[in-house]
Amino acid sequence: MTGTDDAKVLFGVKKIKEATRGNKTFVLEENLSSGGAGLFSIEIIIDSAKAVEIIKENQWKSAKSFADQCYAIRIKNRENNKTFYVLAGGGTGGMYGALDIAEAIECNSINKLLESDNSPYLTKRGIKYNIPLDLRTPTYSDPGDAHQQNIPDTWDLSFWQNYFDEMAVHRYNVMTWWSLQPFPSMVKVAEFPEVALNDVWRTKEKFDDTYSSLGLNFDRPYLFQNIEVLKKITIDEKIVFWKKVMQMAADRGIDIYLFTWNIFTYGATGKHGITRRQDNDTTIAWFRASVREMLKTYPLLRGIGITSGEGMDNKQTGEYANEKWLWKTYGEGIRDGLKNQPDRKFTLVHRFHWASLNEIQKEFKDLPCRLELSLKYAIAHMYSITNPQFILPAIPLLSPQTQSWLTIRNDDIYSFRWANNDYARSFIRNIPAIEKVAGFYMGPDGYCWGRDYLSKLNNNKTPQLIIEKQWYSFMLWGRLSYNPDLPDNTFLQHLPQHFPSINSSELIKGWSSASMIFPWITRFVWGDIDLKWFPEANLSHPNHKGFYTVKDYIERVPMQGSNIDGILVWASNKVEGTKNNLLSPLNVADTLEILSNNSLASLQKLPKPIHQSHGELNQTLSDIQAFALIGKYYAEKIRGACDLALFDKTKIESYRKNALQHLQLAKSFWNQYATIYSTKNKVALYNRVGYVDVEKLKTNVQQDIDMVVKWKPGQNQLIPNGNTEVPFKQ
């Protein structure tokens, strides 16, 4: 098929061979695959000049582009022979074209494969991965079970190989590693020799839900009193390891970026005089030297992302003000690192978080590489509405020269499998001014997108990767961000490969309905950041509200741009006989019930799920049922809150009676949901919302009913609640 030694193309060829072996219609023999329909051959060209020559020879339509990631597929038909040409200007485009052909073979649609010209809609399509390195160099999410469980996987080459393979198949081309700061686990700095860390540590002690949401005090002494050494490895061996990992990524067309929060000195505190103080010149020198060494040590590192917070002293002024500190450390460190490699392509991504554009541009004016920005696109909830409004104030100040990344946070769905083509396509299509968008990275802060240690059903086997478990949603977001015009069948054709024995049309019908339940409840409840709202458990961090009560529902202000009325305003208007053009809370409840009923109706036509079975079909059907049940819970809870609000305003007892009826129904749905959820998933500690134990939360569900029974109209202060952090400052 190809004579190239390009690793990316060879991966595409490997996937073609795997697809052919798995499809009895085709028998691959070197350059030919043969079947009942005739002979098939595949040519992959990754030289633009040669590709143009072949196009002219065959009098084909010219390819639109041979730029990076672009490719054309052309087809030559002869008697009893069809040749597919993948024509590209480089290895990534060649790989993507080969993957198209592999997919067509696997899904029995090779005879339907058409000629095409392909180029990325969004040029950078990434994963946000809070990387759990070591007890001594934590990430933002380390006080949570998933990150602690995934530390050993971080140091396993096969983990990364599988991860990058899956990313490439779904057309992701950026991996962003997020750490409070990783330097002691990744580089040696000659000026600070005591800082570099050998071995990999994990505590045997338990974290709890009392840890800071700002990344502070993750080095409590008790954690170090009982440690386990997960891997004996020197810093030099670590460097070799990370070079191999970055090469693996490059071999799948994936760029590595490293993101940090600031100022954190875990692993270095107390050595050579290093402290967290912002005015400590030794700390500044260490950061600068560490950044320099990251660039010198890892030539495949594509960029560094930085955050002005959460551990910075915003009261500092003068030479130690936040942006000046970041320039002295990261800006100067990058300048040092690029001094002897001025032609290297490198990017500094400065997050808008707690920073302003004017200050960033002022302090980083002498940066010797590309400067890009980053903005929280939907704050922490990508599964809310398809057109978040928060970027709009920034758009006039951005340009193709001053682009922003989109942080697309998924702190909505940790355990479930999600599938809704229309939502994902609309979300991507609605991104405004894409010429001003550098790309996106997608992922959670409150969960680890490594291996699935949450499931109870791993049968003592190595847990599967989250990207494998949630393959359909990862496929949607990756493929549609490369090409949002892909037809639905691109995705639907994979369902019979995963679930050969069932009605795929009925499955996706129910699955799609179920997958809209969290977007609807999240846009209504709207807790902007992750610690304020987790829809799998109607929960926020205990220091915020904990479990959302029926009173809390009355007070919620829905998401900006959702066009939904909050219950307080709706109840006042109803009592006063006035109207507005917003969707009422009862419309939201009705929508949730319809989505749930549609999901359950589809399940009636499919095999009954066995919730304790680890098989993919059973677990997918089980997820759909769980979505539907919590959707019904949310519908009845909203109705109960509406009636309680009317009772509070009117003192009419029938409203209280109605509220109680709705909340009793909500309780029954929660109990059914909790049975399924707890059958599938362990009780877990999450760094952003604390412990999630849906069985234990039955007590809180009952307390809603008790609250309504005791409610005295007019004696409860009801205050609208639902502020959103400002993701952009000029």
Residue ranges of predicted features:
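Aromatic-lined, polymer-binding surfaces characteristic
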Residues: 257, 261-284, 297-304, 309-312, ...
